[in-house]
């Protein structure tokens, strides 16, 4: 590492080209520092990998505790300083946003690839050759997945359920996974849309509402929307069947003028007329709503007490201060339109639901809008005895929803339990001699790194990793055994597809792409220049200001 002086002239005169306080790490030292950062993050995550993985307790600066084994959450909560570590976290977050799962696979594979690259660097193999070999190996790995992946359609409910079960199996909610998997498949199938010849799934249309209390098995799927608000007036009905719903992005209040204005009142009758006029304005708004046939009003803004009174008199159920996102979901669920001007509201703008009802959930009251003809928005109401259980259930459900959506969108699935990884490694070892040279070593190293995932799965299950890896290699020599992986609960190799351990092909492919991209990016860096901290000797810094004041 060098500080301010980083270069010399041919005559040996030092030339300062970086400010004091800056630092530079270059060559092999920079490469090793970056590889060490990748390996350190892998070490932090690998004990959570697989269905027998452990959980992490994360405590933030305020003392708030999070207990989870969700890769994206762990990385998000880790306060990393090293720039390469931050880079890896960004890539992992991209994986989570793209496929909602496979974050740990991407990070752990990146760590294994970094370890193998380090071994090759010690053998004096240039980073460029390693990068080239890794890129060729990545192509073979992706092609292998494409070759062996099984087609899955939205009607293959049994396969989709197994995908959800596999995702939930590695979470803290594994005890309730059978029940939750059914909810996940029904929710995704309900919001899926056929566009052309491809299915599209927008998971924003699956609303997740959390309420502490009850047990995980009290979690329910609502074919509609749950509004976390209560009915605004005690005189209003709490249950409306065959509901015609007005969705308002306008307030049911007397609007104040934009300009500052004063009203001079000389006697009490003028005050009475003023208040009477305000009341008439609100009554007209309520009459306008009632004239459309609406018997439910869900408003994003406020509802005046006078308006509440008139709505209650007409037997209209009303909710105020609903979230904008809830209003948008309600529009999709009920077929209604969100209206910004009450004067423009017509009967064609109303949404329909078989039932709108206020129910008590735990200590709070909520309004359930359900039973629409073909809702394209649904809700999952999560219950749990502890707040942390509810939070972890939400994370588990989001991952499961994402994996099922991935299979529906992509239309392909593969077996888990290391079956895909061992098949990729087998094909890479057959391909490597065709390339020859030093790149062959990089491709073989890639195969070993892929197998490293299986060894970590075995370690976390308390099994002998080398013994199990050898068994799988032997089985995969036979082409008919391509789905053989490791049953981590019995410790024996089994046909993972028949066992029901199924994952989205898209998650596997994206994890391989993300890991390879991360490591090749790291291997190309041979120089790290870090600027000095603010407040040092840079312009405007404290030191410079002190020097200037002393000169004055």
UniProtKB/Swiss-Prot annotation:
InterPro entries: Chaperone_TCP-1 (IPR017998), Chaperonin_TCP-1_CS (IPR002194), Cpn60/GroEL/TCP-1 (IPR002423), TCP-1_chaperonin (IPR053374), thermosome_alpha (IPR054827), Thermosome_arc (IPR012714)
Catalytic activity from the UniProt record: ATP + H2O = ADP + phosphate + H(+)
Coiled-coil region: none
Positions with biased composition (Basic and acidic residues): 540-552
One family name in Pfam for this protein: Cpn60_TCP1
GO CC entries: cytoplasm
Region: Disordered, residue numbers: 531-552
Localization, UniProt: Cytoplasm
Keywords carried by this UniProt record: ATP-binding, Chaperone, Cytoplasm, Hydrolase, Nucleotide-binding, Stress response
The EC number(s) this enzyme carries: 3.6.4.-
Induction entry: Transcription is induced by heat shock (shift from 75 to 86 degrees Celsius). At 80 degrees Celsius and above ThsA and ThsB are the major proteins synthesized (at protein level).
Thermal characteristics: Optimum temperature is 75 degrees Celsius for ATPase activity of the isolated complex.
Keyword presence, Thylakoid: no
Gene Ontology terms, MF aspect: ATP binding; ATP hydrolysis activity; ATP-dependent protein folding chaperone; unfolded protein binding
Record text on subunit structure and interactions: Forms a heterooligomeric complex of two stacked nine-membered rings; one of alpha and the other of beta subunits. Sometimes called a 'rosettasome'.
Family of the protein in this entry: Belongs to the TCP-1 chaperonin family.
Function: Molecular chaperone; binds unfolded polypeptides in vitro, stimulates protein folding and has ATPase activity. One of the most abundant proteins in the cell at all temperatures.
Protein name as annotated: Thermosome subunit beta
The gene coding this protein: thsB
């Amino acid at each position: 590492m060098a500080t301010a002086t980083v270069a010399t002239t041919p005559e040996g005169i030092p030339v300062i080209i970086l400010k004091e306080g800056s630092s530079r790490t270059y060559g092999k030292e920079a490469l090793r520092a970056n590889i060490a950062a990748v390996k350190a993050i892998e070490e932090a995550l690998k004990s959570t990998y697989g269905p027998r993985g452990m959980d992490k307790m994360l405590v933030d600066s305020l003392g708030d505790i999070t207990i989870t084994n969700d890769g994206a959450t762990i990385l998000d909560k880790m306060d990393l300083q090293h720039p390469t570590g931050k880079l890896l976290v960004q890539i992992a977050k991209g994986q989570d946003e793209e496929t909602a799962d496979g974050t740990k696979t991407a990070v752990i594979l990146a760590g294994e690839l970094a370890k193998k690259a380090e071994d090759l660097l010690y053998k004096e193999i240039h980073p460029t050759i390693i990068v080239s070999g890794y890129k060729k190996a990545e192509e073979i790995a992706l092609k292998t997945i494409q070759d062996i992946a099984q087609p899955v359609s939205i009607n293959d409910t049994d396969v989709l359920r197994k995908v959800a079960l596999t995702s939930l199996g590695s979470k803290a909610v594994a005890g309730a996974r059978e029940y939750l998997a059914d909810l996940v498949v029904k929710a995704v199938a309900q919001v899926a849309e056929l566009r052309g010849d491809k299915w599209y799934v927008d998971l924003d249309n699956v609303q997740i509402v959390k309420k502490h209390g009850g047990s995980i098995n009290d979690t329910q799927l609502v074919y509609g929307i749950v509004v976390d608000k209560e009915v605004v007036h005690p005189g209003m009905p709490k249950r409306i069947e065959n509901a015609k719903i007005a969705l308002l992005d306008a307030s049911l209040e007397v609007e104040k003028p934009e300009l500052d204005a004063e009203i001079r009142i000389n006697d009490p009758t003028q005050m009475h007329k003023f208040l009477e006029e305000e009341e008439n304005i609100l009554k007209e708004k309520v009459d306008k709503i009632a004239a459309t046939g609406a018997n439910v009003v869900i408003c994003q803004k406020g509802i005046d007490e006078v308006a509440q009174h008139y709505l209650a008199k007409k037997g209209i159920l009303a909710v105020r201060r609903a979230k904008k996102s809830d209003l948008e979901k309600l529009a999709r669920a009920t077929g209604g339109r969100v209206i910004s001007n009450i004067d423009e509201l017509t009967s064609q703008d109303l949404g329909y639901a078989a039932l709108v009802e206020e129910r008590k959930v735990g200590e709070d009251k909520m309004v359930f809008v359900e039973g629409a003809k073909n809702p394209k928005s649904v809700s999952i109401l999560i219950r749990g005895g502890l707040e942390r259980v509810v939070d972890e259930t939400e994370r588990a459900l989001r991952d499961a929803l994402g994996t099922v959506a991935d299979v529906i969108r992509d239309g392909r699935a593969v077996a888990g339990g290391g079956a895909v990884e061992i098949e990729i490694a087998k094909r890479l070892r057959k391909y490597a001699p065709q390339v020859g040279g030093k790149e062959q070593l990089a491709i073989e190293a890639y195969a070993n790194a892929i197998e490293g995932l299986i060894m970590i799965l075995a370690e976390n299950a308390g099994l002998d990793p080398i013994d199990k890896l050898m068994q799988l290699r032997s089985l995969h020599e036979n082409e008919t055994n391509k789905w053989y992986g490791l049953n981590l609960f019995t410790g024996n190799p089994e046909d993972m597809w028949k066992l029901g351990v199924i994952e989205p092909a898209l998650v596997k492919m994206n994890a391989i792409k993300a890991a390879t991209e991360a490591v090749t990016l790291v291997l190309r860096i041979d120089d790290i220049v870090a600027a000095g901290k603010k407040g040092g000797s840079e312009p405007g810094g404290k030191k410079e200001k002190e020097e200037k004041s002393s000169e004055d």
